[in-house]
Protein backbone atom coordinates (compact mmCIF):
# COMPACT_ATOMS: atom_id res chain seq x y z
CA UNK A 1 0.00 0.00 0.00
CA UNK A 2 1.39 3.42 -1.04
CA UNK A 3 1.83 6.39 1.31
CA UNK A 4 -1.08 8.29 -0.22
CA UNK A 5 -3.39 5.30 0.28
CA UNK A 6 -2.31 4.99 3.91
CA UNK A 7 -2.99 8.73 4.46
CA UNK A 8 -6.47 8.36 2.99
CA UNK A 9 -7.17 5.36 5.24
CA UNK A 10 -6.05 7.22 8.37
CA UNK A 11 -8.09 10.32 7.49
CA UNK A 12 -11.18 8.17 6.93
CA UNK A 13 -10.80 6.35 10.25
CA UNK A 14 -10.12 9.59 12.19
CA UNK A 15 -13.09 11.42 10.71
CA UNK A 16 -15.34 8.44 11.40
CA UNK A 17 -14.23 8.32 15.03
CA UNK A 18 -14.82 12.07 15.56
CA UNK A 19 -18.24 11.87 13.92
CA UNK A 20 -19.29 9.00 16.18
CA UNK A 21 -18.14 10.88 19.30
CA UNK A 22 -20.10 14.00 18.31
CA UNK A 23 -23.19 11.93 17.45
CA UNK A 24 -23.12 10.10 20.77
CA UNK A 25 -22.49 13.35 22.69
CA UNK A 26 -25.36 15.24 21.12
CA UNK A 27 -27.63 12.21 21.45
CA UNK A 28 -26.92 11.98 25.18
CA UNK A 29 -27.42 15.71 25.80
CA UNK A 30 -30.85 15.78 24.21
CA UNK A 31 -32.63 13.27 26.51
CA UNK A 32 -30.89 14.67 29.59
CA UNK A 33 -31.98 18.21 28.75
CA UNK A 34 -35.51 17.05 28.00
CA UNK A 35 -35.80 15.28 31.34
CA UNK A 36 -34.41 18.34 33.19
CA UNK A 37 -36.81 20.73 31.50
CA UNK A 38 -39.77 18.45 32.17
CA UNK A 39 -38.93 18.21 35.85
CA UNK A 40 -38.97 22.05 36.22
CA UNK A 41 -42.35 22.54 34.54
CA UNK A 42 -45.66 22.77 36.41
CA UNK A 43 -47.14 19.52 35.00
CA UNK A 44 -44.21 17.25 35.84
CA UNK A 45 -45.96 13.89 35.44
CA UNK A 46 -47.40 14.60 32.00
CA UNK A 47 -44.20 16.12 30.64
CA UNK A 48 -42.12 13.29 32.03
CA UNK A 49 -44.41 10.72 30.40
CA UNK A 50 -44.10 12.47 27.03
CA UNK A 51 -40.32 12.67 27.21
CA UNK A 52 -39.85 9.08 28.35
CA UNK A 53 -42.30 7.82 25.72
CA UNK A 54 -40.42 9.68 23.01
CA UNK A 55 -37.14 8.17 24.17
CA UNK A 56 -38.65 4.68 24.19
CA UNK A 57 -40.00 5.11 20.66
CA UNK A 58 -36.61 6.38 19.52
CA UNK A 59 -34.84 3.39 21.09
CA UNK A 60 -37.23 0.88 19.51
CA UNK A 61 -36.79 2.54 16.13
CA UNK A 62 -32.99 2.35 16.44
CA UNK A 63 -33.13 -1.33 17.40
CA UNK A 64 -35.39 -2.04 14.41
CA UNK A 65 -32.93 -0.32 12.06
CA UNK A 66 -29.96 -2.25 13.50
CA UNK A 67 -31.70 -5.64 13.22
CA UNK A 68 -32.81 -4.87 9.66
CA UNK A 69 -29.25 -3.98 8.71
CA UNK A 70 -27.95 -7.24 10.18
CA UNK A 71 -30.50 -9.31 8.28
CA UNK A 72 -29.75 -7.49 5.06
CA UNK A 73 -26.01 -8.04 5.55
CA UNK A 74 -26.60 -11.76 6.19
CA UNK A 75 -28.70 -12.12 3.03
CA UNK A 76 -25.91 -10.49 1.03
CA UNK A 77 -23.40 -12.98 2.40
CA UNK A 78 -25.63 -15.87 1.30
CA UNK A 79 -25.38 -14.71 -2.30
CA UNK A 80 -21.62 -15.27 -2.24
CA UNK A 81 -20.74 -18.81 -3.45
CA UNK A 82 -19.39 -21.02 -0.72
CA UNK A 83 -16.46 -22.15 -2.84
CA UNK A 84 -15.45 -18.59 -3.59
CA UNK A 85 -12.04 -17.71 -2.17
CA UNK A 86 -11.26 -14.01 -1.64
CA UNK A 87 -7.90 -13.58 -3.36
CA UNK A 88 -8.37 -10.24 -5.10
CA UNK A 89 -7.41 -6.88 -3.51
CA UNK A 90 -11.05 -5.79 -3.64
CA UNK A 91 -12.11 -8.79 -1.55
CA UNK A 92 -9.11 -8.94 0.77
CA UNK A 93 -7.14 -5.67 0.93
CA UNK A 94 -4.53 -7.11 3.29
CA UNK A 95 -1.68 -8.30 1.08
CA UNK A 96 -0.16 -10.79 3.55
CA UNK A 97 -3.52 -12.47 4.00
CA UNK A 98 -3.93 -12.90 0.24
CA UNK A 99 -0.46 -14.41 -0.05
CA UNK A 100 -1.20 -16.83 2.81
CA UNK A 101 -4.39 -17.95 1.06
CA UNK A 102 -2.54 -18.58 -2.21
CA UNK A 103 0.25 -20.50 -0.47
CA UNK A 104 -2.22 -22.76 1.33
CA UNK A 105 -4.02 -23.42 -1.95
CA UNK A 106 -0.78 -24.57 -3.58
CA UNK A 107 0.03 -26.70 -0.54
CA UNK A 108 -3.41 -28.32 -0.67
CA UNK A 109 -2.83 -29.23 -4.31
CA UNK A 110 0.49 -30.88 -3.48
CA UNK A 111 -1.04 -32.81 -0.58
CA UNK A 112 -3.90 -34.01 -2.79
CA UNK A 113 -1.45 -35.51 -5.28
CA UNK A 114 0.72 -36.92 -2.50
CA UNK A 115 -2.11 -38.56 -0.54
CA UNK A 116 -4.09 -39.84 -3.53
CA UNK A 117 -2.09 -43.05 -3.43
CA UNK A 118 -1.23 -44.19 0.11
CA UNK A 119 2.33 -45.08 0.94
CA UNK A 120 1.40 -48.43 2.48
CA UNK A 121 -1.52 -50.75 1.62
CA UNK A 122 -4.75 -49.78 3.34
CA UNK A 123 -6.93 -52.83 3.97
CA UNK A 124 -9.99 -52.62 6.20
CA UNK A 125 -11.94 -55.61 7.44
CA UNK A 126 -15.32 -56.24 5.86
CA UNK A 127 -14.60 -54.68 2.47
CA UNK A 128 -12.42 -55.57 -0.49
CA UNK A 129 -9.92 -52.72 -0.98
CA UNK A 130 -9.42 -51.05 -4.37
CA UNK A 131 -6.40 -52.04 -6.40
CA UNK A 132 -4.51 -48.81 -5.67
CA UNK A 133 -4.70 -49.50 -1.89
CA UNK A 134 -3.99 -53.23 -2.06
CA UNK A 135 -0.74 -55.14 -1.99
CA UNK A 136 0.76 -54.73 -5.48
CA UNK A 137 2.15 -58.27 -5.67
CA UNK A 138 -1.05 -60.06 -4.60
CA UNK A 139 -3.48 -61.38 -7.17
CA UNK A 140 -6.83 -59.58 -7.19
CA UNK A 141 -9.36 -62.32 -6.40
CA UNK A 142 -12.53 -60.30 -5.77
CA UNK A 143 -14.13 -57.14 -7.16
CA UNK A 144 -13.27 -53.84 -5.55
CA UNK A 145 -15.39 -52.72 -2.58
CA UNK A 146 -16.97 -56.18 -2.24
CA UNK A 147 -18.84 -56.53 1.05
CA UNK A 148 -17.80 -59.84 2.59
CA UNK A 149 -20.69 -60.05 5.06
CA UNK A 150 -23.32 -59.57 2.33
CA UNK A 151 -21.82 -62.37 0.24
CA UNK A 152 -21.85 -64.78 3.16
CA UNK A 153 -25.38 -63.78 4.13
CA UNK A 154 -26.57 -64.52 0.59
CA UNK A 155 -25.61 -68.17 1.13
CA UNK A 156 -28.03 -68.53 4.03
CA UNK A 157 -30.68 -66.50 2.20
CA UNK A 158 -30.56 -68.92 -0.74
CA UNK A 159 -30.85 -71.81 1.69
CA UNK A 160 -33.71 -70.19 3.59
CA UNK A 161 -35.82 -68.86 0.71
CA UNK A 162 -34.85 -71.10 -2.25
CA UNK A 163 -33.78 -74.35 -0.61
CA UNK A 164 -30.47 -74.18 -2.47
CA UNK A 165 -27.27 -75.09 -0.65
CA UNK A 166 -23.99 -74.87 -2.58
CA UNK A 167 -25.87 -75.42 -5.89
CA UNK A 168 -27.44 -78.55 -4.47
CA UNK A 169 -31.22 -78.69 -4.88
CA UNK A 170 -31.56 -81.98 -3.02
CA UNK A 171 -31.53 -80.47 0.48
CA UNK A 172 -33.74 -82.22 3.00
CA UNK A 173 -34.23 -79.81 5.87
CA UNK A 174 -36.86 -78.60 8.27
CA UNK A 175 -37.88 -75.01 8.90
CA UNK A 176 -36.05 -74.90 12.22
CA UNK A 177 -32.77 -76.27 10.80
CA UNK A 178 -29.76 -73.97 10.87
CA UNK A 179 -26.74 -73.74 8.61
CA UNK A 180 -24.84 -76.08 10.91
CA UNK A 181 -27.67 -78.62 10.79
CA UNK A 182 -27.62 -78.65 6.99
CA UNK A 183 -23.84 -79.09 6.84
CA UNK A 184 -24.03 -81.90 9.37
CA UNK A 185 -26.78 -83.67 7.45
CA UNK A 186 -24.98 -83.28 4.12
CA UNK A 187 -21.34 -83.95 5.01
CA UNK A 188 -21.05 -85.24 8.60
CA UNK A 189 -23.80 -87.78 9.26
CA UNK A 190 -23.08 -91.25 7.84
CA UNK A 191 -19.75 -90.03 6.45
CA UNK A 192 -16.57 -92.02 7.08
CA UNK A 193 -14.22 -89.64 5.29
CA UNK A 194 -12.09 -88.06 8.01
CA UNK A 195 -10.94 -85.19 5.80
CA UNK A 196 -14.50 -84.21 4.95
CA UNK A 197 -15.55 -84.48 8.59
CA UNK A 198 -12.72 -82.24 9.72
CA UNK A 199 -13.36 -79.67 7.04
CA UNK A 200 -17.10 -79.70 7.72
CA UNK A 201 -16.51 -78.87 11.39
CA UNK A 202 -14.09 -76.08 10.44
CA UNK A 203 -16.66 -74.81 7.95
CA UNK A 204 -19.36 -74.62 10.63
CA UNK A 205 -17.05 -72.94 13.16
CA UNK A 206 -15.89 -70.39 10.60
CA UNK A 207 -19.44 -69.56 9.53
CA UNK A 208 -20.69 -69.10 13.09
CA UNK A 209 -17.65 -66.96 13.96
CA UNK A 210 -18.25 -64.72 10.97
CA UNK A 211 -22.00 -64.38 11.41
CA UNK A 212 -22.30 -64.06 15.18
CA UNK A 213 -19.01 -62.63 16.47
CA UNK A 214 -20.11 -59.05 15.85
CA UNK A 215 -16.81 -58.23 14.14
CA UNK A 216 -16.10 -57.38 10.52
CA UNK A 217 -15.07 -60.22 8.24
CA UNK A 218 -11.37 -60.24 7.47
CA UNK A 219 -10.03 -61.03 4.04
CA UNK A 220 -8.37 -64.24 5.26
CA UNK A 221 -11.65 -65.45 6.75
CA UNK A 222 -13.53 -64.69 3.55
CA UNK A 223 -10.96 -66.47 1.37
CA UNK A 224 -11.07 -69.49 3.67
CA UNK A 225 -14.87 -69.48 3.57
CA UNK A 226 -14.88 -69.36 -0.24
CA UNK A 227 -12.43 -72.27 -0.39
CA UNK A 228 -14.70 -74.32 1.86
CA UNK A 229 -17.69 -73.51 -0.35
CA UNK A 230 -15.82 -74.61 -3.48
CA UNK A 231 -14.61 -77.77 -1.79
CA UNK A 232 -18.02 -78.87 -0.53
CA UNK A 233 -19.62 -77.78 -3.79
CA UNK A 234 -17.38 -80.23 -5.64
CA UNK A 235 -18.17 -82.89 -3.06
CA UNK A 236 -21.90 -82.30 -3.63
CA UNK A 237 -21.52 -82.63 -7.40
CA UNK A 238 -19.96 -86.08 -7.01
CA UNK A 239 -23.08 -87.36 -5.24
CA UNK A 240 -25.47 -88.40 -8.00
CA UNK A 241 -28.77 -89.32 -6.33
CA UNK A 242 -30.98 -89.22 -9.43
CA UNK A 243 -30.41 -92.92 -10.28
CA UNK A 244 -30.22 -94.28 -6.76
CA UNK A 245 -33.13 -96.65 -7.45
CA UNK A 246 -31.34 -98.19 -10.44
CA UNK A 247 -28.27 -99.42 -8.57
CA UNK A 248 -29.21 -103.03 -9.33
CA UNK A 249 -28.60 -102.52 -13.05
CA UNK A 250 -24.94 -103.23 -13.79
CA UNK A 251 -24.47 -102.44 -17.44
CA UNK A 252 -21.46 -103.85 -19.28
CA UNK A 253 -19.36 -102.06 -21.89
CA UNK A 254 -21.72 -102.62 -24.80
CA UNK A 255 -24.82 -101.56 -22.91
CA UNK A 256 -23.16 -98.33 -21.81
CA UNK A 257 -23.47 -97.04 -25.36
CA UNK A 258 -27.28 -96.91 -25.16
CA UNK A 259 -28.49 -93.37 -25.69
CA UNK A 260 -24.94 -91.97 -25.83
CA UNK A 261 -25.24 -90.11 -29.09
CA UNK A 262 -23.97 -86.62 -29.67
CA UNK A 263 -26.42 -84.30 -27.98
CA UNK A 264 -27.43 -80.70 -28.40
CA UNK A 265 -27.32 -80.26 -24.64
CA UNK A 266 -24.39 -79.95 -22.28
CA UNK A 267 -24.03 -79.95 -18.52
CA UNK A 268 -21.42 -77.22 -18.76
CA UNK A 269 -23.10 -73.99 -17.60
CA UNK A 270 -20.28 -71.94 -19.11
CA UNK A 271 -20.54 -73.43 -22.60
CA UNK A 272 -19.60 -70.68 -25.05
CA UNK A 273 -20.81 -72.08 -28.36
CA UNK A 274 -23.33 -70.07 -30.32
CA UNK A 275 -26.30 -72.30 -29.48
CA UNK A 276 -25.61 -72.11 -25.77
CA UNK A 277 -25.22 -68.33 -25.91
CA UNK A 278 -28.51 -67.99 -27.78
CA UNK A 279 -30.36 -69.86 -25.05
CA UNK A 280 -28.73 -68.13 -22.08
CA UNK A 281 -31.27 -65.30 -22.05
CA UNK A 282 -34.01 -67.77 -21.12
CA UNK A 283 -32.47 -68.23 -17.69
CA UNK A 284 -32.70 -65.57 -14.96
CA UNK A 285 -29.25 -66.66 -13.77
CA UNK A 286 -26.55 -69.04 -15.12
CA UNK A 287 -28.22 -72.47 -15.26
CA UNK A 288 -27.04 -75.19 -12.95
CA UNK A 289 -28.22 -78.05 -15.15
CA UNK A 290 -28.11 -78.64 -18.92
CA UNK A 291 -27.52 -76.21 -21.79
CA UNK A 292 -28.16 -76.91 -25.49
CA UNK A 293 -25.32 -77.79 -27.82
CA UNK A 294 -25.11 -77.84 -31.60
CA UNK A 295 -26.40 -81.36 -32.30
CA UNK A 296 -30.03 -82.16 -33.09
CA UNK A 297 -29.95 -85.70 -31.73
CA UNK A 298 -31.54 -86.92 -28.53
CA UNK A 299 -29.60 -87.30 -25.30
CA UNK A 300 -32.22 -89.04 -23.21
CA UNK A 301 -35.35 -91.07 -23.63
CA UNK A 302 -38.45 -90.74 -21.54
CA UNK A 303 -39.58 -94.13 -20.33
CA UNK A 304 -43.31 -94.55 -20.73
CA UNK A 305 -45.60 -95.66 -17.95
CA UNK A 306 -45.69 -99.15 -19.39
CA UNK A 307 -42.01 -99.73 -18.76
CA UNK A 308 -41.13 -99.80 -15.06
CA UNK A 309 -37.39 -100.03 -14.62
CA UNK A 310 -37.15 -98.88 -11.04
CA UNK A 311 -39.46 -101.59 -9.73
CA UNK A 312 -38.34 -104.28 -12.12
CA UNK A 313 -37.93 -107.71 -10.58
CA UNK A 314 -35.61 -108.96 -13.32
CA UNK A 315 -32.10 -110.03 -12.57
CA UNK A 316 -29.17 -107.73 -13.28
CA UNK A 317 -28.15 -107.52 -16.92
CA UNK A 318 -25.13 -109.72 -17.35
CA UNK A 319 -25.47 -111.05 -20.92
CA UNK A 320 -25.74 -109.49 -24.34
CA UNK A 321 -29.22 -110.94 -24.80
CA UNK A 322 -30.45 -109.08 -21.73
CA UNK A 323 -28.92 -105.88 -23.05
CA UNK A 324 -30.58 -106.36 -26.43
CA UNK A 325 -33.94 -106.89 -24.73
CA UNK A 326 -33.51 -103.69 -22.75
CA UNK A 327 -32.52 -101.81 -25.92
CA UNK A 328 -35.68 -103.08 -27.63
CA UNK A 329 -37.84 -101.82 -24.74
CA UNK A 330 -36.22 -98.40 -24.87
CA UNK A 331 -36.68 -98.12 -28.63
CA UNK A 332 -40.43 -98.64 -28.18
CA UNK A 333 -40.67 -96.01 -25.43
CA UNK A 334 -41.70 -92.41 -26.08
CA UNK A 335 -38.83 -90.13 -27.14
CA UNK A 336 -38.35 -86.41 -26.46
CA UNK A 337 -35.92 -83.87 -27.78
CA UNK A 338 -35.16 -82.88 -24.23
CA UNK A 339 -33.00 -83.80 -21.30
CA UNK A 340 -33.49 -85.09 -17.82
CA UNK A 341 -33.05 -82.17 -15.47
CA UNK A 342 -31.18 -83.31 -12.42
From Swiss-Prot:
Compartments, record wording: Membrane
Statement: the UniProt record of this protein carries the keyword Metal-binding: no
Gene: DLT1
Similarity annotation: Belongs to the DLT1 family.
Main location: membrane
Source organism of the structure: Saccharomyces cerevisiae (strain ATCC 204508 / S288c)
Membrane topology: Multi-pass membrane protein
Extracellular side: 37-47
A GO CC term attached to the entry: membrane
Consequences of knocking out this gene: Sensitivity to 6-azauracil (6AU) and mycophenolic acid (MPA).
Alphabetized InterPro entries for the sequence: DLT1
Lineage, opening ranks: Eukaryota, Fungi, Dikarya, Ascomycota, Saccharomycotina
UniProt name for this protein: Defect at low temperature protein 1
Record keyword Membrane present: yes
Function (record text): Required for growth under high-pressure and low-temperature conditions.
Cytoplasmic side: 1-15, 69-342
Recorded superkingdom: Eukaryota
